[in-house]
Structure formats: C-alpha cells, structure tokens
C-alpha cells in the first residue's frame, strides 16, 4: 500500500495537458500515459477490422471485460457478470443486442484487502484512491470498442448521476449495478435488458 505522500506525488501528473497533433503527441515531463483502461476495447476495434477484411459474417469476440458483437443484423444475447459472485461464469442479467461493443468495469476483478478494507483497482484521479461511487460495476454499450471501454471506467468513477451527460454526449447506454444490488439501465437499453437472478432490484 503506497504512503499518502507517494499518492500525492503521483497525483501531480493527473489532469496534465497532453498535446496531440498530426505529427504525434507531446506529454509533459513526469507524466505517464497508461492505456490499461482502454486496451481491451482497442483490441475489439482492431479485431473488427480483421473480420471485415476476411469477410466474416458473424462473430462474438471476448477480450476480458470487453466484447465485440459482429454480424449482419441478427441480434446477440450477452450475459452481464454477477459482480457479487466468486464465479466469473455467473451472470445476473442479459442483454439482447445488435452488432456493437460491450464493456464492463467493476471493483470485483482486481483488489486486495487490508485491515478489513477492500481496495480495488479503479482509481479516482482526484484522490488517488479507489473510486467510491456506490457502484460495483458499470456495463457500457456503444458502437466503438475504445469508447465503450473508456466510458465504463469513467462512469464507474463518476457515479450514476454524473455519468448521464457523458453517456448522452457519446451516444452510449449503460447498466449500473450498485453496492446494494439495485440496478439502473439508461435510455433504450432498458428494452434489451432482462434480470435473470433473484436479489437484484431494477429501479
């Protein structure tokens, strides 16, 4: 566990202005870009290009927490992992969707416990500590893998209310699962959502 002074020092590199132009990217001294929160989504976008080039008609590609649904119009059924279960194969709900990308970020994947406190891997850039938004997972659906991956992480940190304008801005929809097992589904995604497991409450 880092000391408070180490966390404060690391925060000095957040909110730094990164300059992007046609020649490349300029990163301020002492700042490091970590693309870990979008790598799986980018992989989905790259795979889609390969599928298109190979003239594949239909595919489901899972890259960890991101899924590419690729096809010719027929819908797919995707399970959303139960964030309270130890089993990664156990879902609590399902979505019926056309071709798109689906990404989930949650506090249940990578964490450690110390002194009775659970520390997960999704950090709040304002505090340097694990985000405390009342959420246990966020699943984002949109056309772009990179965007779905980035938004699922951002929405987890922001929390439900602050995420709504961001989702609207990028034309994305989401499923929010709270610590008390309540669930909120945004926009038209509600028509594609179905609870499968007892104990969860759709608000």
Identify what each model region corresponds to.
Residues 1-203:
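Mature catalytic core of soluble alpha/beta enzymes
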């Amino acid at each position: 566990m880092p000391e408070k002074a180490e966390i404060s020092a690391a925060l000095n590199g957040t909110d730094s202005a990164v300059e992007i132009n046609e020649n490349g990217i300029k990163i301020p001294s002492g700042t490091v870009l970590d693309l870990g929160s979008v790598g799986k989504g980018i992989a989905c976008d790259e795979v889609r290009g390969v599928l298109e080039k190979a003239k594949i008609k239909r595919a489901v590609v899972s890259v960890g927490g991101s899924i590419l649904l690729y096809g010719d119009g027929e819908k797919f059924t995707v399970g959303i992992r139960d964030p309270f279960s130890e089993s990664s194969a156990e879902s609590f709900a399902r979505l019926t969707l056309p071709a798109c990308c689906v990404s989930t970020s949650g506090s249940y994947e990578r964490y450690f416990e110390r002194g009775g406190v659970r520390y997960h891997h999704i950090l709040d850039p304002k505090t340097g500590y694990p985000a405390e938004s009342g959420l246990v997972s966020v699943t984002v659906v949109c056309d772009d893998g990179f965007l779905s991956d980035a938004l699922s992480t951002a929405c987890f940190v922001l929390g439900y209310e602050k995420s709504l304008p961001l989702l609207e801005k990028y034309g994305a929809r989401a499923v929010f699962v709270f610590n008390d097992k309540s669930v909120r589904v945004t926009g038209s995604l509600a028509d594609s959502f179905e609870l499968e497991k007892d104990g969860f409450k759709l608000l």
